[in-house]
Design a protein with these regions (language model features):
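Thiol-based oxidoreductase modules, predominantly thioredoxin-like and allied folds used
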Residues: 3-10, 29, 41, 48, ...
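Local sequence-structure signature of Cys/Sec-based thiol-disulfide redox active-site neighborhoods
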Residues: 13-53
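Beta-strand cores of modular interaction/reader domains in eukaryotic scaffold and signaling proteins
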Residues: 25-30, 64-67, 88-93
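Eukaryotic short linear interaction motifs
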Residues: 35-36, 73-75, 97-99
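A short glycine-leucine-enriched loop at secondary-structure breakpoints
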Residues: 78-84
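Non-catalytic, surface beta->alpha helical segment in thiol-disulfide oxidoreductase systems
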Residues: 84-132
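Arg/Lys-rich, intrinsically disordered low-complexity tails that mediate electrostatic binding
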Residues: 131-175
Length: 175
């Protein structure tokens, strides 16, 4: 887990390299003199202390938490578009191809407090964990039973009939 204040070119290039290395980046973009930004920045800085206390496993190893002033946006090569307003909190992963704003996330609590930020970060890390598994949806039991293995349609049904279907002989019944 890394916390970065993007105030010089070295730190900005370090963040660009972190995105290229497929790290999960949580970025706060603020503007000097902005009232909501002034209120949000101290809450964002508390994330460091809270997450350092929670690092009991490998959950946060691939995480970078950064903050930058709006003037540095042109130097950030991975940003697709400029923020709609300030402050703007972004989640960036998959080498910059996945970008989501805090306001567009599925978290219930969207207030700019430490609790809502931690909830957002944890929800993104859980979602990332489950994305690597099965692709596509599960077949329902009704659909599986409707497949005619004497005349399967398509590659998936053929493979299901060949490898996945349990015949009545192989099924176990629980009493």
């Amino acid at each position: 887990m890394k916390f970065v204040q993007l105030n010089n070119d070295d730190k900005i290039s370090e963040l660009n390299n972190s995105v290229k290395a497929n790290k999960q980046v949580f970025l706060l973009i603020y503007m000097e003199g902005c009232g909501p930004c002034i209120e949000t920045r101290p809450e964002w800085k508390k994330i460091e202390n809270v997450l350092k206390g929670k690092t009991n496993g490998k959950k946060y190893n691939n995480v970078v938490i950064a903050e930058t002033e709006k003037d540095n946006l042109k130097k950030l090569t991975f940003l697709k578009n400029e923020p709609k307003g300030f402050p703007s909190m972004k989640y960036i992963s998959n080498k910059g191809s996945l970008q989501e704003d805090f306001e567009d996330s599925n978290t219930k609590n969207k207030t700019r407090t430490i609790d809502s930020f931690i909830e957002w970060i944890d929800s993104k890390l859980k979602a990332e964990k489950y994305q690597k598994g099965q692709k596509g949806g599960k077949w329902s039991r009704k659909y599986k039973l409707s497949i005619n293995c004497r005349r399967p349609r398509g590659f998936s049904q053929k493979n299901y009939c060949k490898y996945g279907r349990k015949t009545k002989k192989n099924r176990t019944t629980y009493k």
